[in-house]
Amino acid sequence: MVNHIVMWNFKEVIKEEDKAGLKAAMEENLKALVGKVPGLLTVEFVASPITSSTHDIALVTTLETAEDIAIYAKHPEHVKVADTYVRPYVKDRACLDY
């Protein structure tokens, strides 16, 4: 099993009052990928980090193998969710796989 962690910050143009709705949509759609993407076992979405954090939101996933990370990254369902609910609103992506 491997973990794939991705963290982002919201773009400056995103209004504070819009962030809760965006976080909810991200979480719902990212969690819905379990069962659709081969090798993707679990999805946790961190929407409320403590104030010492350097990023606004995080995605913590567990996959069966390291090779499944590449499958996940290119899977059409993941790309659709990322392009619709995540990428338009975020910047400063950081990733750690282990």
Regions found by a protein language model. Give the residues of each.
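Short S/T/G/P-rich N-terminal loop/turn motif that feeds into the first structured element of a domain
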Residues: 1-56, 64-74, 98
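C-terminal structural segments of small proteins and small subunits
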Residues: 63-94
